[in-house]
Each structure stands twice: as structure tokens, then as C-alpha cells.
């Protein structure tokens, strides 16, 4: 796995912040693709799926105010909280859903794979579950990431 120094620094910060989490959490989207060892394209931020309880308990310790996500045609979050205190922006999301086939689909990973970096550990959905998730997002960049994950074999 080769990831950029800025992604590594951001993941290290996320791991430290979420150490007291009581519920499972995951890195998803482009950063998760990179952690699986596939080409994610541009990793502009780190998307973190977290429980609402942990978001309300942990994020205020960073001076953040968890809020309902802004309305969007394709994505929604019960809580959406951006954090700019790392090399890459981090977006914490609770009760995250995407619209596919006219229905909202809640993202609740069933798998949780630990990935160790240089002094940190984070969690991602397994490769097949991540591929299904990204396919559901349906954007061209996500479909390209699905292909890149599939190319890993």
C-alpha cells in the first residue's frame, strides 16, 4: 500500500481522535480505495463513517459542532461535520445514505477490515463491500474506483 504523506498524516489524526469511539467506524470512499492498495484517483478528503452517538460525544472535543447534513440530491447525512485540522480535510458522517434507483440506501457496512499505517490503525469496509458501496454512489469517479479495486484481483 502506497499512500501520500498528506493522507497518512490525516489518517493518523483520525485514528487518534476516534480512539475513544464506542461504536465501529470506517474510512470510506477514495481514502478507503487507497488503503486497499488501488488507485483512487484524486483523494481530496477523508470520509469517515461514524455513529451519531460517537459524533455527538467526540467531535465537540475538537471544537466541532455536529449538524445535520445539507440537502443534496444524491447524498444525505443525519450528521455531517467537516474538520480542517489535518493535511487533508476530514468529513465525519453519521446516518449517511445515498440515493440509488429512486430509494435512499443507508450505508451500514457489515465488514470492518483493520489497516495499519506508520503508527496508526484505521478501518475500512472489505474490498467487495466497498465496491458495492461505490457502485451505488454511481458517479463516474466512483465507478472508476470500482474498476481499480476489481483490478487488484
Describe each PLM feature range.
Residues 1-153:
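Compositionally biased terminal segments of proteins
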Amino acid at each position: 500500500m502506497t499512500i501520500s504523506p498528506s493522507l497518512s498524516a490525516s489518517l493518523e489524526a483520525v485514528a487518534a481522535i476516534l480512539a475513544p469511539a464506542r461504536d465501529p467506524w470506517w474510512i470510506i470512499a477514495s481514502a478507503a480505495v487507497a488503503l486497499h492498495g488501488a488507485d483512487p484517483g484524486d483523494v481530496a478528503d477523508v470520509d469517515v463513517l461514524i455513529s451519531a452517538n460517537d459524533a455527538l460525544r467526540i467531535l465537540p472535543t475538537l471544537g466541532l459542532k455536529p449538524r445535520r447534513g445539507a440537502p443534496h440530491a444524491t447524498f444525505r447525512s443525519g450528521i455531517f461535520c467537516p474538520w480542517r485540522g489535518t493535511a487533508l480535510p476530514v468529513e465525519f458522517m453519521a446516518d449517511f445514505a445515498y440515493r440509488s434507483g429512486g430509494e435512499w440506501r443507508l450505508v451500514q457496512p457489515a465488514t470492518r477490515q483493520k489497516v495499519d499505517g506508520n503508527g496508526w490503525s484505521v478501518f475500512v469496509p472489505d474490498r467487495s463491500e466497498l465496491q458495492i458501496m461505490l457502485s451505488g454512489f454511481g458517479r463516474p469517479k466512483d465507478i472508476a474506483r470500482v474498476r481499480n479495486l476489481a483490478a487488484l484481483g
